[in-house]
Amino acid sequence: MALKILFWGTPGYAVPTLDALHDAGHRIVAVVTQPDRRRGRGKQLIPSAVKTRALELDLPVYTPEKIRRDLSCQQQLADLGADLSVVVAFGQILPPEVLFQPPLGCWNGHGSLLPRWRGAGPIQWSILEGDVQTGVGVMAMEEGLDTGPVLIERALAIGLLENAHQLGERLSQLTAELMVEALPLIESAGPGPEDERHRRLGLRPQRQDVTYARMINKSDYQLDWTGSALAIHRKVMA
């Protein structure tokens, strides 16, 4: 059955999932993304990749500066009557009023094998730290940062000569595939109390060996020429 989905995402990484949900016949009731930002030498306002794609698909778009504080936007989104929210790299922390509003929950496609690399930069940190594999998980969202139990996940190997852009392309496609795969499972659990829905779905709680992937900054890319060739290679790839 086609589900009514509220989609949250911002960068190009999230576009394949938006496309996949649309192509699968689900009804995207609206897309929520970050506001246009000034970029480039001319400081022109540039829309996010997700906004650009949503407009091409003729979907309603909301661009709250801070969804936590925008009570009007929260109410407008609630009034759309979505069955669930799908979140892929949105870029803001969602408040409880948003997380727990849809009857089938709020679900996130995350580019790592949780609990390794919770946070904003899992792709870059998996390369910087020399991980041999990473993956994608679809998890039920909680108030904590990437702390929710996992519904489904899939691993993939990281190539020695694979850079962050290339790895991100593969992970974004895998995220789209897994989210489409997850939706019938989520629907089968039906609405009701969150703990009961999660029990019916058999979600996997995250283990205790947690690592965090903070946002990469310019200093992280400074090369230390006294370091090993492998460490330098990883920084270049990330």
Task: State each model region's role.
Residues 1-238:
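One-carbon transfer enzymes
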